[in-house]
C-alpha cells in the first residue's frame, strides 16, 4: 500500500511519485489550499492539496486530525521561506494526486503532542505510542535487540529458547503461579530467570548460549521495575569471570558506540565492601563527586559525647560527606535534609561549613566546633578535602544504617545541587560480594542466588565460616543503575548441596526442589559462568529516560495493573471450577 515511509523522504526523491500511508498529524484548510502533516513511524512530511485536482481537494476537505489515509503524490521542493527545520523532511513536500480515507477518527482522549498524566497514557497506550518521542524509543529498542543478536552470534553464542511453564524454585522474589487443569491442585511457575535451564544447556554441551527472554517476578515495583521484564540471558562453558565480563563489557561498548556514538571510558573494578564503605551503595553513581569519608578516629576523644560514645564501638561508623559549594545551603535547606535522613533511621546529622579567610586560614561554622580541638578540625578538613565554600555533613551509628543513610543522602545532594557530571557515563564492575547475609530473623540467604560459586574457599571452611565467604559474582553498574549481574556457577554436586545445606535446606527438600539439577551436575558438568542484562533498563539508559515504562510497549503500573486491558481480572467461574480453585473472601483470610 505504500512505496516509502513519510520520514524517509528527502531531496533525492524530488520529482518522484510516491505512495504514502499514515495519520493526519496536523490539518490546515486555507480555502484554496489544504496542508496536512502526514505521520508514520519514521516521521512526518507536509502534503499539499490544491484545486488542480478538484475531487481530491473535496475529499481532503473532509480530513481531520488522526484520520488514517493513503495518498499518491509528487515530491517537490519547498520555497526557502517555507522550510521547516523542526522535521527531517522540512525541505520538501508532497503534492497530492490521489487520496483514500482508510478510516476516520474520533477526537483523541489524549493529546499526543503534549504532556498527559501517566494514567491516561497507560489507559490509551496505543495512542500514546503515536507520540514521536515514544515511537523513537521503541524503534531504538528494536535496534538494540538487533545489535545484541548480531554481536552474540559473531561471538559464537546460540539463541536457544527455554520453557515458560516450569517448576517453582526459590530465587528471591515470589513466583507467578499457573494452575494445571490436568494435574489438579498442582501449579507451574513462570520463570524468574532461565537460570537452571541455561546451566543444564552447559551440561548438554551447548557451550555458548544466549536468549532475549521474558522473565516474571511478583515483587514490589518502582520506576525501573516491572512484574514482567526482558533479560539478555547469557551462559558459557570453559570460561572464567574475567573472560565473561570482557565479552559483556564489549557488548555494552558496542551498544553505546552504535546508539549514543560514545566510546565508554574504562570500566573500573570495585569491591562490594569498598562500594558500601565509600558510597553507601553497591551500585554507586560515580558521576557524583560526593564520597563517604570515615572520621571515627578523629572524633573518639571529642567532648561531644554523642559522637565519642558511638565512635568507641567497632560496629559503628562516624563519617562525613563533603558537598562542594554546599556552604550556600540555608538552615531551612539543612533542616530538610535532616528530615529526609530520619526516614532511614538516623535522628540527626551534624553540619560544618568551611570558609577560607583572607589570611588563607580555614575557618568553620558549626554547632560542634566548640567540642573539637582546632587540630582535630584541621584533620577533618584535610581528610575530607574540604575547600572554601564547602559543607560537611556528619553522621554516626551502626555500620549498615550509616551506609544506607549517607548513601541515600549522597544521591539526593548530587541531584538537588546538580553535582553529577552531565552528559557522561560512569561504568564499573562491582565484585567480591559476600556469599551470604543474614535476614531480620537471623537466617542466612544467598546475596545473589544459590547457584553462585564461592571464591577461593574449601567446603570445610565454608561450612565453618559461611559469612566470610566471597561470591565469585560480578555486577555491571552504569550511572547508578545495575544494568546486569552474573557469576561463576557451581559445577560440583557436593558443593551445590553444601550451599543448599548452609541455606537451611534439608536433603529431602533439596531432592524435592532441585533433585533433577543435582543429578545433572554428577554427569560431567563443565566449569561455566553467566550473565544477564536487564534489557528494559539498558534501553532506558540508552534513550535517556528515567522511567522503565517509557521503553516498554505495553507496561504495567506500579501496582502491576494493565490500565488498558484492565488486567488482572476476575476469573471465569467455569474455568476456576475446572482448575479446582476456590476464591476465598479476602476479609476472612
Curated annotation (Swiss-Prot):
SUPFAM superfamilies: Class II aaRS and biotin synthetases, GAD domain-like, Nucleic acid-binding proteins. InterPro entries: Aa-tRNA-synt_II (IPR004364), aa-tRNA-synth_II (IPR006195), aa-tRNA-synth_II/BPL/LPL (IPR045864), Asp-tRNA-ligase_1 (IPR004524), Asp-tRNA-ligase_1_N (IPR047089), Asp/Asn-tRNA-synth_IIb (IPR002312), AspRS_core (IPR047090), GAD-like_sf (IPR004115). GO terms for cellular component: cytoplasm. Gene3D superfamilies: Bira Bifunctional Protein, Domain 2, GAD-like domain, Nucleic acid-binding proteins. One of its GO terms (biological process) is aspartyl-tRNA aminoacylation. It is found in: Cytoplasm. It catalyses: tRNA(Asp) + L-aspartate + ATP = L-aspartyl-tRNA(Asp) + AMP + diphosphate. One of its GO terms (molecular function) is aspartate-tRNA ligase activity. L-aspartate binds at residues 171, 217, 448, 489. Residues 195-198 are annotated as: Aspartate. Its EC number is 6.1.1.12. Keywords: Aminoacyl-tRNA synthetase, ATP-binding, Cytoplasm, Ligase, Nucleotide-binding, Protein biosynthesis. It comes from the Bacteria. ATP binds at residues 217-219, 226, 482, 534-537. Belongs to the class-II aminoacyl-tRNA synthetase family. Type 1 subfamily. Homodimer. Catalyzes the attachment of L-aspartate to tRNA(Asp) in a two-step reaction: L-aspartate is first activated by ATP to form Asp-AMP and then transferred to the acceptor end of tRNA(Asp). This is Aspartate--tRNA ligase. It comes from Baumannia cicadellinicola subsp. Homalodisca coagulata. The lineage of its organism: Bacteria, Pseudomonadati, Pseudomonadota, Gammaproteobacteria, Candidatus Palibaumannia.
